[in-house]
Structures are given as structure tokens and as C-alpha cells.
Amino acid sequence: MAVAALFVSAISLWVAIRTEQANEELVAASTWPFLQVQVSNADPDAKLDLQFQVVNTGVGPAKVESFELFWKGKPYTSSATLLAACCSYREVKATSPEAKSHTPLLKGTVQGIVLRAGEAETFIRYRLGDDNLAVWSALDKAREQMRYRICYCSVLDQCWKSELQAELYFRGQLHPEEVKSCPIPSVAYIK
């Protein structure tokens, strides 16, 4: 009788441990974020509008710990410096006389934000206007040579680092590297 009780206790303990592991895996799966970069050159109204976004296509929120943008292998800290390098962009001050006829470059930040599942954050937006055809066309072409590195964590502090580009066929894009914590980049993209 004692042997049977010991056997039942051992099986109960094994079942409890397996149930706990299954529950932990279920919670992790139900809070899993997955970040991707999406780039488009037209808005829903078919207006020519370059938009660069980080999108959370996972099921849980993502805490974006670091974000880096590279063009031709060189890191950039802002969209203005990137466009100056790739596309001969010249920033116009809002107080200058030519500002009224100047198509603005809209900038955003990704690092340090929390993206809910299904949410997107735009970090560059540049509409085609009467004054910027050459710069806009150069940026549309340069986006093919852009790469991104992003590190993000779930609400359970599971973290991943991804090397991305806008085209989804980029090798490894669907398999981010799991990391213990996100490294601090030497040159982070800020805005």
C-alpha cells in the first residue's frame, strides 16, 4: 500500500511539473511580440508617400530597447542625416521664407517605445511634392540598400535581436536571435 501511495505521489509530482512547464510556454507564446520593418511608397489614396514603419506583427506588446538604421553599411542617427547622405536632401528651417513651399520630412523615433500587437510606428515619412522629386526618387531607390537592427523584449523580459530589411525574403528575418538583454548600440537611430 505504501509503495502504491509513493507511486501515485511520484506521478502526481511529474504531472504537476509538466503542467507548470506547459503553462509557462503558453503564457510566453501568448505574449510573443514580433517586429518587422515595412516600407511603402504610396498611401491608401494612391498618393506617392514614402513611409518607413516598424510594425509589431506578433501577439504581445514589444518594448523596443534599441533601433539602428544602416545605409550602405553605415549607421545613421536621424532621417535628416540619412537623406542628406543618400539623396542630397537639404533641411529647411520652419522660419525661412522657402518653408511655405517646402515638402516637410516627417520624423519619428522607435527606440524606447512600447508597440502593442498590431501597432505600427512611423520613423520616416516623406510625401512627393512639387519641390522634391529628385530627393524623393533617390530615397525610393536608396531604401533597397537600407538595413535595420532592432532589439526588443516581451512583457516577460524575453528579448530578441533582429537584422531586418523591408523585403521579407531577407535571410533570417523570420528568425530573430533570442538574447539575454539588448545591447546598447554605439550609433542609435533617434529621429
Question: Model-flagged regions — what are they?
Answer:
Residues Q38, E68-K72, A80-L82, L133, ...:
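Generic alpha-helical propensity signal that fires on short helical segments
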Residues L50-F52, F67, Y76-S79, W136-A138, ...:
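Surface-exposed beta-strand edges and their flanking turn/coil or helix-capping segments
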Residues G108-H175:
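Terminal connector regions
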Residues M1-H102, P183-I184, A188-K191:
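Membrane-proximal alpha-helical anchors
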Residues S79-V92, R149, V155-K191:
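Acidic, serine/threonine- and proline-rich intrinsically disordered appendage/tail regions
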